[in-house]
Amino acid sequence: MQATAEPFRVPPGTEVTLAFVDDDAMRVLNHRYRRKDKTTDVLSFGDELPPGVKGPDAARRLAPGPDGVIHLGDVVISAAQAARQARKRHWPLSSEVAFLAAHGVLHLLGYEDETDSGYREMLALGRKAVASARQ
């Protein structure tokens, strides 16, 4: 997670909750929040950033809680889907989890993958985060 946060100047002490669930729980979340009745690999839930805000310093736009901590949001990963994707991509499960965690954090920082250009940008940033995490 730190490898994703560093290039985006996320303030020290900013928190992200990372949760792992099974496919059934992920399907329920995906249906409830995205109206898609199937499992998915990762979902992110965070405070709404102002329109057009993404990337460097995006987290600084969020107000700290009473404890002074900025809670960037929650990232939920389907453990089973991560394992399937790791096998398909022929890389370790730890790399897939790092990629999915980075992907989730990027969403919390205002990035989107609904367009081709947004998808390519997030894919490149996610791969960069995994490479940084390996060093």
Locate each region found by the language model.
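Catalytic glutamate of the conserved HExxH
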Residues: 100, 104-108
